[in-house]
Curated annotation (Swiss-Prot):
It comes from the Eukaryota. Residues 1-29 form the signal peptide. GO terms for cellular component: extracellular region. The active site is at residues 184, 366, 419. Its EC number is 3.4.16.-. Disulfide bonds join 88-331, 252-266, 290-297. It comes from Arabidopsis thaliana. GO terms for molecular function: serine-type carboxypeptidase activity. This is Serine carboxypeptidase-like 4. It holds the Pfam family Peptidase_S10. Probable carboxypeptidase. Belongs to the peptidase S10 family. Keywords: Carboxypeptidase, Disulfide bond, Glycoprotein, Hydrolase, Protease, Secreted, Signal. GO terms for biological process: proteolysis.
Length: 441
């Protein structure tokens, strides 16, 4: 009887160990993807997808897409790209902004939407990791209930942990120059992540990451600048009259958000401003705010991507864990999230002091994060200019304007650009290529 009990206990322990072993099989998993449903033929680049577990028990499973540089992956820079949001999937970067694939904008007929190659992918010159973060974004998920909700500063730590583990499993890239990039809301998280990596590099027990700098497009940085400068931007772009602009300046004194409820005169003019601009497409003021879903509508690609990413053959090809999520959504707004970084300006200051390069660029037709606000917070850093405001060119054509500073920061506008890179793919690619190669714009 005793022997039977011992046998039963041993059997239970072996079963438990087996289950633990199986549970670890999807942790830190990686798969090479050679074909993707919707794309004709083999992929013309090397794609890897997988999960990296972070947290004390690796309960958070972060999903990534990794694409090797199409030029020289052994030596080219490695760029981690963080999509804004928070809660917007890395597919936004991969299929809309600076990746090697895009949705083919055909009328949806019930079949799987098609993918096409892009001409100006940043993977032409760098290896790229597109990361679904925070947890709950894209295909990332948690195996247990989280007691600490994600936050800006918390994400910086999780991303740092992700990178340490990812590079531990891809040691052939550990010596490559490493950069962090992103756009929109990532303007808060990326500088904090850079600082977190920099601090980690100084600690004895961490494997150093070959961090060189960061790149940000139309980055949300501080609402004091980003939000308040929407008014002068609208005036410069002829969206509001001279008279209204002067009235706003006089009554609001540069403070156009969180106006005191007793300041009725300022509120009156802010309301008039909102009425004049509420039908303007925020991400690009020259684009239409579509009311119908047609291929000519900017947001049509979002619908196509939703059909594509929720197709079972696509999920199988990407090796998506069935535990991950139900329906994939491009931007999941239901993530409990603590917005604990109100301004990333101090992080920029610290990163500059630590000697990291930075490229800050602005599409000049974005009213969400207008270039005027970005210029204002850069001025607040009070760095000396080494290359004053000048045009940067592509084949004798003005592609934008740029200024360089002694702290290794470069600011550039992109003429005709919007909130993200896809509005001007050639210009943003050429700008990035020159900067990442250490060339002047």
């Amino acid at each position: 009887m005793a022997n039977n009990n011992v046998y039963s206990v041993l059997k239970s322990l072996l079963l438990l160990l087996h289950l633990v072993f199986l549970s670890k099989q999807h942790v830190d998993s990686a798969s090479i993807v050679k074909f993707l449903p919707g794309f004709e033929g083999p992929l013309p680049f090397e794609l890897e997808t997988g999960y990296i577990g972070v947290g004390e028990e690796e309960e958070v499973q972060l999903f990534y897409y990794f694409i090797k540089s199409e030029r020289n992956p052994k030596e080219d820079p490695l760029l981690l790209w963080l999509t804004g949001g928070p809660g917007c999937s890395a597919i936004s970067g991969l299929l809309y902004q600076n990746g090697p694939l895009a949705m083919k904008l055909d009328v949806y007929n019930g079949t799987l939407p098609s993918l096409v190659s892009t001409t100006y992918s940043w993977t032409k010159t760098s290896s790229m990791i597109f990361l679904d973060q925070p947890v709950g974004t894209g295909f990332s998920y948690s195996r247990t209930q989280l007691f600490n909700k994600p936050s800006d500063t918390g994400e910086a730590k999780r991303i740092h942990e992700f990178l340490q583990k990812w590079l531990g499993k891809h040691q052939e890239f550990s010596s490559n120059p490493f950069y962090v990039g992103g756009d929109s809301y990532s303007g808060l998280v990326v500088p904090a992540t850079v600082q977190e990596i920099s601090k980690g590099n100084c600690q004895c027990c961490n494997r150093p990451i070959n961090l060189q700098g960061y790149v940000l497009g139309n980055p949300l940085t501080d609402c004091v600048y980003d939000c308040n400068y929407r008014v002068p931007f609208a005036h410069k772009m002829a969206l509001i009259s001279d008279e209204l602009y002067e009235s706003l300046k006089r009554t609001c004194r540069g403070e156009y958000v969180n106006v005191h409820p007793h300041d009725t005169e300022c509120l009156k003019f802010v309301e008039e401003f909102n009425k004049l601009t509420n039908r303007v497409c925020e991400r690009h003021i020259l684009h239409s705010c579509c009311e119908t879903e047609t291929p000519s509508c900017y947001s049509y690609r979002f619908m196509l991507t939703t059909y594509w990413a929720n197709d079972e053959t696509v999920r199988k090809a990407l090796q998506i864990n069935k535990e991950s999520i139900g329906e994939w959504t491009r931007c999941y707004r239901g993530i409990p999230y603590n917005h604990d970084i109100k301004s990333s300006v101090p992080y920029h200051m610290n990163n500059s002091i630590d000697g990291y390069r930075s490229l800050i660029y602005s599409g000049d037709h974005d009213i969400q994060v207008p270039f005027l606000g970005t210029q204002a917070w850069i001025r607040s850093l009070n760095y000396s200019i080494i290359d004053d405001w000048r045009p940067w060119m592509i084949k004798d054509q003005i592609a934008g304007y740029t200024t360089s500073y002694v702290n290794k920061m470069t600011f550039a506008t992109v003429t005709g650009g919007g909130h993200t890179a896809e509005f001007t793919p050639k210009e943003t690619f050429m700008m990035f290529q020159r900067w990442i190669n250490g060339q002047p714009l």
